[in-house]
From Swiss-Prot:
Pathway: Porphyrin-containing compound metabolism; chlorophyll biosynthesis (light-independent). InterPro entries: AcsF, Ferritin-like_SF, Rr_diiron-bd_dom. GO terms for biological process: light-independent chlorophyll biosynthetic process; photosynthesis. The lineage of its organism: Bacteria, Bacillati, Cyanobacteriota, Cyanophyceae, Synechococcales. It catalyses: Mg-protoporphyrin IX 13-monomethyl ester + 3 NADPH + 3 O2 + 2 H(+) = 3,8-divinyl protochlorophyllide a + 3 NADP(+) + 5 H2O. This is Magnesium-protoporphyrin IX monomethyl ester [oxidative] cyclase. Catalyzes the formation of the isocyclic ring in chlorophyll biosynthesis. Mediates the cyclase reaction, which results in the formation of divinylprotochlorophyllide (Pchlide) characteristic of all chlorophylls from magnesium-protoporphyrin IX 13-monomethyl ester (MgPMME). It comes from Synechococcus sp. (strain CC9311).
Length: 360
């Protein structure tokens, strides 16, 4: 179930802004990660050091240093939204801010913990933390236009952290950054052609914004190539398939569940996600050894079954039944989700050298 804008909030003394409690954690909300810092510090970058140094030089230029500056278009823009659009847009801001802030925390901690042992890697993470903090702050400032803001300090201490081995961090964050690029640029291009659907001026910033996401994805691409065991062999192929499926399925189920936001922009959530998935899958073939067969009708048929199961789970949550009864009612839907994910995972993947031969 996606996060909602209706959570507890507390007023900030002497301010018109209310501090909003974080949305309840679910399988669809952004995760906070930690990893093995010693293993990261010990990584040998020499197999692809030249490319990593070139990417770090790009980070140093900080192309968007002066991009995230609010202008007069924000004045009164929040008051122009009807209540339903306002609600779904605040949900979008909250989820996006949380996601960007989780990236900041991970990258910042990595840069701090490996600085002395792996300075090039630490510097890259420091630059990416700068970008993510800038994004999160800009989103949180937009929330204040609606009289709300996230307490990012409280978020840091209250969220549970998921431990991932470094290679799993690489898979997950690479996909997150590349998906972020395609999500932002797709919305920007659509609103360029349909300016009447631009419900808030923050979307004017998405063209440059998405380039940060793209550069971050390129960094993880280069880092995996410096650690070739992450993208070679049977285990790597299986893990790449797993992360592709997990990330695509989560995004699709979440976006269809909150399709009203995309409708407010004049987009169809399903069509939007299909484009983002297709483009990300294509990008992923540049580094992953296999990609998913997203053109196979079975793929989206399976995702639709997950959507239906998620809707059924949300319906159970909305009832007044006692917790044990809810648990029993949810059980068959959880089992069905697990079986469907297994079926999708077992679909034959496409070898990247066959899917995208021009880049191998």
């Amino acid at each position: 179930m996606p996060p909602t804008a209706v959570t507890e909030a507390t007023a900030v003394p002497g301010s018109n802004v209310t501090t909003k409690d974080p949305a309840k954690d679910t399988i669809l909300t952004p995760r906070f990660y930690t990893t093995d810092f010693e293993a990261m510090a010990a990584m040998d970058l020499r197999p692809n050091e030249a490319e990593l140094e070139a990417i770090c030089e790009e980070f140093r230029k900080d192309y968007n240093r002066h991009h995230f500056v609010r202008n007069g278009e924000f004045d009164g823009a929040a008051d122009q939204l009807d209540p339903e659009t306002r609600k779904v847009f605040v949900e979008f801001l909250e989820q996006s801010c949380t996601s960007e802030f989780s990236g900041f925390l991970l990258y910042k901690e990595l840069s701090r913990r490996i600085k002395t042992k792996n300075p090039l890697l630490a510097e890259c993470f420091s630059h990416m933390a700068r970008d993510e903090a800038r994004h999160a702050g800009f989103l949180n400032k937009s929330m204040s236009d609606f009289g709300l803001q996230l307490d990012l300090g409280f978020l840091t201490s209250s969220k549970s952290y998921t431990f991932f081995k470094p290679k799993f961090i690489f898979y997950a964050t690479y996909l997150s950054e590349k998906i972020g690029y395609w999500r932002y640029i797709t919305i920007f291009r659509h609103l360029e052609q349909n300016p009447d659907s631009k419900i808030f001026p923050i979307f004017n910033f998405f063209e440059n914004w998405c380039q940060d996401e793209n550069r971050h994805g390129d960094f993880f691409d280069a880092l995996m190539k410096a650690q070739p065991e992450t993208v070679r062999g049977l285990r790597a192929r299986l893990w790449c398939r797993f992360f592709l499926l997990a990330v695509f399925a989560t995004m699709y189920v979440r976006d269809v569940a909150r399709k009203e936001f995309y409708e407010a922009l004049g987009l169809d959530a399903r069509e939007y996600d299909r484009l983002v998935i297709d483009k990300t899958n294509e990008n992923t073939a540049r580094v992953f050894p296999v990609v998913l067969d997203v053109k196979n009708p079975r793929f989206y048929n399976g995702l639709e079954r997950l959507v239906n199961n998620n809707a059924a789970l949300s319906a159970v949550d909305a009832t007044q039944a006692p917790a044990p009864i809810k648990l029993l009612r949810k059980l068959p839907h959880w089992v069905a989700n697990g079986a469907q994910m297994a079926s999708l995972f077992l679909m034959a993947p496409i070898r990247s050298d066959r899917y995208h031969p021009s880049v191998r």
